A protein has these predicted regions:
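Basic/polar N-terminal segments that are highly enriched at the extreme N-terminus
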Residues: 1-14, 580
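Core subunits and conserved enzymes of cellular information-processing
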Residues: 241, 245, 249-251, 317-320, ...
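A glycine-rich helix N-cap at a beta->alpha junction
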Residues: 86-112, 117-120, 125-128
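Long, charged, mostly alpha-helical binding arms that flank functional sites
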Residues: 263-343
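N-terminal catalytic cores of NTP/NDP-binding nucleotidyl/phosphoryl-transfer enzymes
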Residues: 14-91, 206-238
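Active-site cores that bind ATP or allylic diphosphates and position pyrophosphate for catalysis
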Residues: 72, 76-78, 84, 106, ...
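Residue-level signal for inorganic ion chemistry
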Residues: 30, 59, 90, 121, ...
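Conserved short loop/turn motifs at secondary-structure junctions
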Residues: 41-44, 73-81, 103-112, 135, ...
Length: 580
């Protein structure tokens, strides 16, 4: 298993430089006319996850830093898996992260140009129609140490391949009956050079072009040419595309054969993927989670999708902070999710509005406080931000407090509510606990205390020191709310490797393996919580800190009649302590 890596900020910045230095070197040498143009090329077959966010920050960040442009290009070459829903979701996620693309393109914009290029390759003897099955073609490719076997169709007459290629697109040829392959080198050590498939038949309607096309280009054939058509100067990809780069370059060479491309061609550079502990990020696995109901949709706050993080309460800046910390390298590492959560805490500490909420309530009665009296006390919205202002919170004789904040027989260093001990009620008074009431089962139903009227802010004894400060809400001036406590979706540190190991050992499908390692406690719903009324005035997705509990946000499903709050992250990394 890959070691957990938490790199120091200095080394992270240094690791990013290998890409920046390459770009700056090109600019100094006058390549590409001194311009920088990048692209973010997602396939619209699912929702973006935090791994895509790393690529987005690089693609858009490099362009911004050097006064260039980053375009958005949808790699829509597989109509069976693509949908307009995903297109719109991807655009929303990019904008939420704070970026705006220069132009919006689609690989389908170039279908005619790619088709014409494929025709030319057939005419030049560089491509042929192969009627073998996909299984046989794969077998004939050989291994990295053994050369492949040439297809019996490799030298089929050019006119015959041309005629069949046109039939592939006319609808006369069934899916899987034949493919178009580039004629390169079946003995090349790079497996991608062994006559790669560049076109196949897909009869499913395309979300943009309808039924115009039945023959569709493969990724390797469409990607580099699309970069070239758009004038991309720096094509930034993850490490698995290192072995694809020679093919990327070859197709561009063939496309512009006989012309000098040294100073005007896309340059592919690879960086490491984002791997995160306690997280699965393959779209295939995420789709399984959604389809099988193991999560509540793509934006379930337990999902590593950008929309899931947004709903959970992560801010764009917190994701940027995390990506800055891990940097970009040329080797894979498993990054500790605690580093992401730390970035979220750091950011939310400066922006979250502080409010009072009680999630496991027990009634606290101040026996010497006048019945019917209500005071409005000032509560600071954010002590880290003086400009955030304050709001008023009502105080009365009967309050809700956290059940965990009372102990009838407490140890010596217990500084919360216990008989005979004083604590301060946040923003209010110092009180002394006098006892409690229990039901027939011994469950505490009420806690009693007396208050010192001289200890409110501005009073003579306001600065009297006590060791414990507790939060509360007034019973008659609060709102009932549902609180959703989200935790890590997986029980194991590296679910990707664990999933593969289980499937190999049991010869089972992904779903069965997932059920073995999914965390059954990743969501706890608390329906009877109480929160101060001020929270109901805030818009959905507002960043909040429930004092002494953690960071939360208002869920998109929350209504005035049913308030719903999601836990974003705790105030401290309790998971790390539990699992030590």
């Amino acid at each position: 298993m890959t070691d957990i890596k938490n790199e120091e900020v200095a080394s992270e910045k240094k690791s990013l430089n290998f890409i920046e230095q390459a770009v700056e070197k090109d600019l100094k040498e006058g390549k590409n006319g001194g311009k920088v143009q990048t692209r973010f090329p997602p396939e619209p077959n699912g929702y973006l996850h935090i791994g895509h966010a790393k690529a987005i920050c690089l693609d858009f960040g490099i362009a911004e830093k050097h006064g260039g442009v980053c375009n958005l290009r949808f790699d829509d070459t597989n109509p069976t898996k693509e949908d307009v829903e995903y297109v719109e979701a991807i655009k929303e996620d990019i904008q939420w992260l704070g970026y705006q693309w220069g132009n919006e393109y689609y690989a389908s914009d170039y279908f005619q140009q790619l088709w014409d290029f494929a025709i030319r390759l057939i005419q030049e003897g560089k491509a042929y129609i192969d009627e073998q099955s996909s299984e046989l073609i794969a077998q004939q490719k050989g291994t990295p140490t053994q050369p492949g076997v040439e297809s019996p169709y490799r030298n089929r007459p050019i006119e015959e391949s041309l005629e069949l290629f046109k039939k592939m697109n006319s609808g006369e040829i069934e899916e899987g009956a034949m493919v178009l392959r580039a004629k390169i080198d079946m003995a090349n050590p790079n497996m991608h050079f062994r006559d790669p498939i560049i076109y196949r038949v897909v009869k499913h309607p395309h979300h943009r072009t309808g039924t115009t096309w039945k023959a569709y280009p493969m990724y390797d054939f469409a990607h580099g040419q699309s970069d070239f058509f758009e004038g991309v100067t720096h094509s930034l990809c993850t490490l698995e595309f290192v072995v694809h780069r020679p093919l990327y370059d070859l197709f561009i060479d063939w496309l512009k054969e006989g012309k000098d491309l040294n100073d005007n061609r896309p340059r592919q550079t690879e960086f490491n993927k984002l791997n995160l502990s306690y997280t699965l990020m393959s779209k295939r696995n995420l789709l399984t989670l959604v389809k099988e109901g193991l999560v509540n949709g793509w934006d379930d706050p337990r999902m590593p999708t950008i929309c899931g993080f947004r709903r959970r309460g992560y801010s764009p800046k917190s994701i940027h902070k995390f990506i800055d910390k891990i940097g970009y390298t040329t080797y894979d590492a498993l990054n500790d999710i605690a580093l992401l959560e730390s970035s979220v805490r750091d950011d939310l500490n400066s922006r979250a509005t502080r409010i009072s909420a009680v999630i496991n309530p027990v009634k606290l009665i101040i026996t010497n406080y006048p019945e019917g009296q209500v005071e409005e006390l000032e509560a600071i919205n954010n002590p880290e931000d003086p400009e955030a202002g304050s709001h008023l919170i009502e105080f009365s004789r009967e309050l809700w407090m956290e059940r965990e904040d009372f102990m009838e027989n407490a140890p010596k260093k217990y500084f919360r509510m216990t008989p005979g001990q004083e604590v301060r009620l946040k923003n209010a008074y110092i009180v002394k606990c006098t006892g409690c009431k229990k039901d027939e089962n011994g469950v505490i139903t009420e806690v009693y205390c007396e208050y010192d009227a001289n200890t409110r802010s501005g009073m003579p004894d306001a600065n009297r020191k006590v060791k414990g400060t507790l939060h509360w809400v007034s019973c008659n001036h609060c709102l009932q709310a549902e609180v959703r406590l989200y935790d890590r979706l997986w029980k194991v540190e590296n679910p990707r490797d664990e999933l593969a190991a289980i499937r190999e050992a049991k010869k089972c499908e992904a779903l069965e393996a997932m059920k073995e390692i999914i965390n059954p406690d990743s969501l706890k719903v608390l329906p009877n919580c109480y929160i101060e009324k001020f929270a109901a005035t805030l818009p959905p997705l507002s960043y909040l800190q429930f004092q002494r509990i953690g960071y939360f946000n208002i869920d998109k499903e929350s209504t005035p009649d049913k308030l719903i709050f999601n836990r974003t992250v705790g105030l401290k990394d309790t998971w790390g302590k539990i699992n030590k």
